[in-house]
Amino acid sequence: MATLTNVTFGGTAWIPQFVQSINQTKCIGCGRCFKACGRDVLALKALNDEGEWVEDEDDEEIERKVMTIANRDKCIGCEACSRVCPKNCYTHESLN
């Protein structure tokens, strides 16, 4: 399959890099990536001290929150999330 290549307004070739994964051990749940993404790709989810997902209503069980990929299909490959992440949690790949 061919690689998806776009051209910027200035004529430079650009290959979108789509979000593949978030390293949840490194994620500090700061929300910077969530604010940078205007496409509703990400969601902040809660974990308990055993590393299991918990509902936000169970406040007493929440150990910490981490970012997750909620809607991968909405990613446009801009990598804004990765650029603002202070812990470099993101892995991106081009379409092949």
Curated annotation (Swiss-Prot):
InterPro entries: 4Fe4S_Fe-S-bd, 4Fe4S_Fe_S_CS, FdIII_4_nif, Fe-S_Ferredoxin
GO aspect biological process, one term: nitrogen fixation
Keyword Electron transport carried by entry: yes
Listed cofactors: [4Fe-4S] cluster
Keyword GTP-binding applies: no
Gene Ontology molecular function: any one: 4 iron, 4 sulfur cluster binding
Disulfide-bonded cysteines: none
Comment on bound cofactor: Binds 2 [4Fe-4S] clusters.
Keywords: 4Fe-4S, Electron transport, Iron, Iron-sulfur, Metal-binding, Nitrogen fixation, Repeat, Transport
Pfam families documented for this protein: Fer4_7
Ligand binding ([4Fe-4S] cluster 2): C75, C78, C81, C85
Superkingdom field: Bacteria
Binding locations of [4Fe-4S] cluster 1: C27, C30, C33, C37
Domain (4Fe-4S ferredoxin-type) ranges: 18-47, 65-95
Function: Ferredoxins are iron-sulfur proteins that transfer electrons in a wide variety of metabolic reactions.
Quaternary data: Homodimer.
Record-linked NCBIfam families: fdxN_nitrog
Protein name, as recorded: Ferredoxin-3
